Amino acid sequence: LALEGSTAHVQAFAPRPMLFVLGLGDLAEALAAQGALVGIEVRATDDPAEIGALGPTDGLVVLTHDHEVATPVLARVLGATQGGYVGSLGSRHTQRERIARLVAAGVADPESRIFGPAGLAIGSRTSQETALAIVAEMLAVIRGRKGGHLRDDAGPING
């Protein structure tokens, strides 16, 4: 940037990604630790009112299996944004039930917008491994990547 013979350098910074976690416990703690490693701010809560709107680099992971708590939060978040990452923990049966409830609540196309069961398929066995799989999936989604093996991807290795 040049101003009347002076030169100034401008460096823009993207906002830090935010991951909202609905539910507390070991996995929420592991998500906070994993998020910190890669520069994601994690806010874990049991209070649905604390879940904010998602920006294009933000995410939500629903850990609770209580449909009465999860459905309104997911409906609100999916209704307010087309971007970001939305994941939900639970079995495939739980995911089908969750999708059916969201469709009944009038949410458009929830099955293509929710990543559930959340996380990349790395064979997770511990809370820490599950957190790694979820954070990696979130990063892949917000960066427009598939999250597969680099050897199978012709795109850029970094970024």
Positions of the model-derived regions?
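Adenosine-phosphate binding glycine-rich loop
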Residues: 83, 89-159
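Segments forming oxygen-rich coordination pockets for charged ligands
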Residues: 1-46, 50-57, 102, 141, ...
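Short, well-ordered alpha-helices that flank and scaffold nucleotide-derived cofactor binding pockets
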Residues: 33, 37, 75, 79, ...
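Generic structural signal for well-ordered, non-membrane alpha-helical segments
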Residues: 24, 28, 66-67, 95, ...
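Rossmann-like adenosine-cofactor binding region
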Residues: 52-97
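Hydrophobic/aromatic beta-strand patches that form the interior of the parallel beta-sheet core
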Residues: 20, 43, 59-61, 87, ...
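Fold-independent oxyanion-binding glycine-rich loops
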Residues: 24, 46-47, 64-66, 117-118
